[in-house]
């Protein structure tokens, strides 16, 4: 079988780790970018998104521009995802990547270019998972997570892809402050389960 590494977040460092450890090909070598490779996600949101089969991922009704106090992020309110690689001004990507419409390229015309980009990435994800010749190695970076915590994720993957052969690699993230800041940025409140779980395990 053909092994394909695909990131499930929480940030793009999961995808970087997969490339550095020869679990995932680079774009130059033919890898087609998938939706969770270059964004900021959370496991409950990913499970809900997969359960919905990405129905609201690119829906402008659920997209907004979120100001975190330092910069603006394209934000999906339903799944609580942030898209830093398409956000105005983030790391001056609009300059280094030469976005055709400048700073606001991905939010212009009701997120038209954002939608186009992510529809392609969603289709790449579906293509990889639907190919019976592929063995999918998912890479998930998440704090204090074990295989026993992934029951719902595995369940929803099998629901939509019943013949899928896969394995999930968990990368630990024990930087408590970094995780808390990320959860706050994604609009999680400190009395929600993600914070409760973090506080219980990390103190």
Residue ranges and their predicted role:
Residues 1-203:
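Extracellular glycan-modifying ectodomains
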């Amino acid at each position: 079988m053909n092994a394909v590494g695909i990131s499930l977040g929480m940030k793009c460092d999961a995808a970087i780790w997969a490339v550095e450890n020869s679990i995932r090909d680079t774009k130059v070598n033919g890898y087609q970018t998938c939706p969770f490779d270059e964004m900021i996600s959370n496991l409950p949101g990913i499970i809900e998104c997969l359960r919905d089969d990405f129905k609201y991922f690119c829906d402008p009704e659920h997209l907004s521009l979120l100001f975190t106090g330092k910069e603006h992020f394209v934000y999906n309110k339903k799944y609580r995802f942030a898209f830093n690689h398409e956000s105005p001004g983030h790391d001056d990507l609009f300059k280094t990547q030469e976005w055709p419409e400048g700073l606001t390229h991905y939010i212009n015309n009701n997120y038209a270019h954002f939608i186009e980009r992510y529809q392609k990435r969603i289709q790449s994800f579906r293509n990889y998972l639907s190919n019976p010749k592929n063995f999918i190695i998912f890479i998930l970076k998440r704090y204090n997570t074990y295989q026993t915590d992934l029951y719902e994720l595995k369940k929803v993957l099998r629901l939509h892809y019943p013949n899928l052969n896969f394995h999930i690699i968990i990368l630990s993230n024990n930087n408590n402050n970094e995780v808390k800041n990320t959860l706050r940025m994604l609009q999680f409140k400190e009395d929600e389960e993600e914070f409760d779980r973090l506080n219980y395990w990390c103190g």
